[in-house]
A protein has these predicted regions:
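Catalytic adenosine-cofactor/nucleotide-binding cores of aminoacyl-tRNA synthetases and other
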Residues: 204
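Short, intrinsically disordered, charge-balanced linker/junction segments flanking boundaries
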Residues: 232-236
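His/Asp/Glu-rich acidic catalytic environments and adjacent acidic regulatory segments
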Residues: 1-201, 212, 216-221, 228
């Protein structure tokens, strides 16, 4: 349903934000703020509304508005398609079967019992069926068998990659459209566009924070990595 509704709501949103007459009235109020006495709440509301319109293309010229409309409409189709593929791929691999009881070692008994009951309902009594949407973390954390943990991790990590629900091409298109949209609105990247409304404000500030944390956190991270390696050897 969202695949049908999303383009319609996007068109409606564009019709509102790109309405020249409506934005002129908003801009008139915004530009007059310096000479008016607004309380804090009203001033914030005016700023938020103006910013929302500006971030959705209201300041663009007519030609760029049409480009913005086209980009928005394409994204309105691709974005739910991406999510739909993720959901379908998740459903496809959701039932994880284990037939060897020895591979269950370490998994809490309550989860083993639930998997056994599910297997019975599926007509495979004597096996265990784990729903990965709820049991993924349990298997990875508690299962003693390394090959099982690896198998589950690979299954979850390879969703929508090279199969019937492959999202690779969709991701490329979304990435390019987001970049083009950000450029159109005066931002270097999509990250800059998004972060402009967040505490970080820009990707450069994010990179600076990461760089500032690298040196003081490196030694502890290395120790944690060594501890994990040692723990993995113990499990083997």
């Amino acid at each position: 349903l969202i695949n049908d509704i999303n383009p319609l709501t996007t068109k409606l949103s564009n019709d509102i934000y790109l309405n020249k007459d409506l934005f002129l009235r908003i801009k008139e109020v915004f530009d007059s703020m310096g000479g008016m006495s607004y309380n804090e709440e009203d001033a914030r509301l005016i700023n938020e509304i103006y910013s929302s319109f500006a971030r959705n293309g209201a300041n663009l010229n007519d030609d760029d508005k049409e480009i913005y409309r086209k980009i928005s409409q394409e994204l309105s189709i691709l974005t739910p398609k991406f999510s739909d593929n993720v959901l379908k791929a998740s459903n496809k691999i959701n039932k994880y079967w284990i037939d060897d009881e020895n591979l269950l070692t370490g998994i809490p008994q309550s989860f083993i019992d639930a998997a056994s009951e599910l297997a019975k309902k599926e007509g495979r009594e004597g096996s265990w069926c784990f729903s990965l949407d709820t049991n993924f973390g349990i298997i990875v954390k508690f299962c003693k068998d390394r090959s099982t943990r690896k198998d589950v991790l690979c299954l979850m990590g390879s969703k929508c990659n090279g199969d019937e629900f492959d999202n690779t091409d969709i991701l490329r298109k979304i990435s390019k459209l987001r970049h083009d949209k950000a450029n159109l609105l005066g931002y270097d990247t999509h990250a800059d566009y998004v972060l402009n409304r967040r505490m970080a404000q820009s990707k450069n500030n994010v990179y600076k924070l990461i760089d500032d944390l690298i040196v003081p956190s490196f030694d502890k991270s290395k120790k944690e990595f060594d501890d994990i390696k040692a723990y993995a050897k113990e499990l083997d």
